Regions:
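Helix-loop-helix hairpin linking two adjacent transmembrane segments in secondary transporters
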Residues: 112, 119-173
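Helix-to-loop junctions at the C-terminal end of transmembrane segments
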Residues: 37-52, 257-272, 292
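Conserved MFS/SLC helix-loop-helix module at the cytosolic interface between two early adjacent transmembrane helices
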Residues: 36-78
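Juxtamembrane intracellular "pre-TM" segments in multi-pass secondary transporters
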Residues: 175-210
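C-terminal transmembrane helical hairpin of 12-TM major facilitator-type secondary transporters
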Residues: 251, 267, 271-321
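Intracellular juxtamembrane helix-capping segments at the cytosolic ends
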Residues: 6, 10, 85, 92-108, ...
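Hydrophobic core of transmembrane alpha-helices in multi-pass small-molecule transporters
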Residues: 64-68, 77-94, 102, 215-216, ...
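Extracytoplasmic gate region of multi-pass secondary transporters
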Residues: 3-10, 199-263, 270, 275, ...
Length: 321
């Protein structure tokens, strides 16, 4: 969510060997690795490896921490691509995929989108704080120490929260699983729903239309995260502080928009269908990118602030639909 800070640092402090144009693909590669690996991970952890979800999340955390730690010893630009762009993000996917599946099983259908929205908004909370954190650490401790500190933060927060996620029933002893289901029969949450991979859905053309839309939206969402900070500094000639504020303003609206669009998708009394809500998010974010950034040849600060807030709100809420 805050890779633009590192991107600018790599370009202004060229201490590594290699082609520095490659640093621009790290942010996009990280998104691509996560999005492309998640369908396979979802399929594996839905049923076959459901009891290994916690193990996968712990392994993913360790992989992400080790990847950032290894990146602190990089001597070539491609080392950063391999560690930060590929390995660290695959570790993140190992955490995110089982967590997402568990979330969908322990919440009722009526509130699933809202639950996803609240959970996904956490990444925007982190993305709102990290630009200032990374900028301060890079200015004081330089690159190597910064990524090592970040690896420690990941380890401390992730290992603690992973154990708060309820264990999948297939990993519990039979007696405990029966007691859990019996206790939930009269409760609001209900027993965990058994999930199966809906293979017949692949015969419907609608799923491919949605897949293409998600791919395009996901690819576009990562561009401002990577290049907005550099654009503000090199094209708009804004100060370093202004560039950091733009990236923060890009992330802050997503904190509310995830929950908002999740609520609209869940609300059966709303006049908007789930498809309409997704279209509102996609079309509004697309128009803001064209009108507020694409046609903004002068790169004024006011217009870029408006773009960051508008695009961050509407594009951020797409995942919750």
């Amino acid at each position: 969510m805050s890779y633009g800070i590192f991107q600018e640092y790599y370009l202004t402090h060229q201490t590594l060997s290699g082609n520095y144009d490659l640093t621009g693909i790290i942010g996009m590669t990280s998104n691509g690795v996560m999005y492309l690996s998640m369908p396979l991970l979802f399929a594996l952890f839905t049923k076959r490896w459901a009891k290994f979800r916690q193990t996968a999340m712990l392994s993913g955390t360790i992989l992400a921490c080790l990847s950032f730690l290894l990146s602190s010893f990089s001597t070539q630009v491609w080392h950063l691509v391999a560690t930060q762009g590929v390995l660290a993000c695959f570790g993140s996917a190992l955490v995110f995929s089982p967590m997402t599946l568990s979330l969908g099983e322990w919440y009722k259908t009526d509130h699933r989108a809202l639950a996803y929205g609240v959970t996904l908004s956490c990444k925007n909370i982190v993305g709102s704080v990290c630009p200032f954190l990374f900028s301060s650490l890079l200015g004081r401790y330089k690159f190597s120490s910064t990524v090592r500190i970040w690896a420690l933060i990941i380890a401390g927060t992730s290992l603690f929260t992973i154990f708060l996620i309820p264990t999948h029933p297939s990993a519990l002893p039979a007696a405990v699983s029966d007691l859990t289901e019996g206790a939930n029969e009269g409760g609001d949450a209900g027993p965990p729903r058994s999930r199966k991979i809906p293979w017949p859905s692949l015969r419907h053309g609608t799923i491919y239309i949605y897949s293409i839309a998600i791919i395009l939206q996901s690819a576009a969402y990562g561009i401002p995260q990577t290049y907005l900070n550099t654009y503000a500094s090199e094209v708009a000639l804004l100060s370093h502080t202004s560039a950091i504020i733009l990236l923060t303003l890009f992330n802050i609206p997503g904190i509310a928009s995830f929950s908002f669009f999740g609520y609209l998708s869940d609300n059966k009394h709303s006049t908007f269908s789930a498809t309409t809500v997704a279209c509102i998010s996609a079309m509004s974010s697309g128009l803001s990118a064209i009108l507020l950034w694409g046609l903004n040849t002068q790169g004024s600060l006011a217009t870029l602030i408006l773009f960051s807030i508008t695009f961050g709100f509407f594009a951020g809420g797409y995942s919750a639909t």
